[in-house]
Amino acid sequence: MTLIRVFLDGWFNVSPLYLASGVPSVSLENGRIVNNMSDPAFERAMQFQYDLNRNGLILDKSLFNWTPQVQYIGEGKELFYISGLYEIESAPEIWTKTLGNQEDVMFVPVPRDENADKYYYNAELDCYNLCTGAANPEGVVRLMECIIASYYDENTIAISNQKHVDDYGWSQEMLDMKDEVTRITQENPLRDIAGGLTSDVSSMITNAVNEPFNGNDWFTVKESVEDSVNLQIDEINQKISELEN
């Protein structure tokens, strides 16, 4: 029987790891879309992920019908699983089934890129749409004000923390780490906007940046798609210019 020991598992590893470099695959600069796939920092981040795979540190999900094996954490077979806190925001009897004994489970922020000038962190965006002609736009404004206030209101935070202790079985160490991750994220938040582009170019970029993590050389992958990506980004920027005129 093969003894399995894995450093990293999961589906959501690629973007947090390369965003730590401080460079997303695509960014918005001066109102225009910019392709960063050839940026040296981004290329280095892609090479890092390729090296993780080449050194056998990533779970080969193809051996498990493309399903992460989170239970390996509880079994002591793997170390890290990049995900959201929702994985442990439920009753302890639920999340301990896969992650192991309550006292043995902890989370940490994605490590800082030692070559980056700052500690950049993958930030999620909470967005709300207001339909044209909505009957009560002022109500939407009040809702947004309440949501924003809830992020900083001490009483709201205290209630949330107590819920994490009482309902989710969190320790004070976990609460402190949640605060630390929030602090890091707020200092230098970074988001890749590739997913917000047209479906064709978005899929092309997303598929490409996933390749090094799966064991394919980034420079070869980039060469195969870069011209097409640049062409489509140029078309998007042209449309932006037309809308401005």
Stretches with model-predicted labels:
Residues 28-63:
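Glycine-centered hinge/linker elements that transmit conformational signals in sensory
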Residues 96-166:
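Extracytoplasmic/periplasmic substrate-recognition and gating elements
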Residues 61-74:
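Short helix-initiation/N-cap motifs at beta->coil->alpha
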Residues 1-34:
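Extracytoplasmic/periplasmic solute-binding protein
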Residues 132, 137-141, 151-245:
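Conserved C-terminal helix/tail region of periplasmic/extracytoplasmic solute-binding proteins
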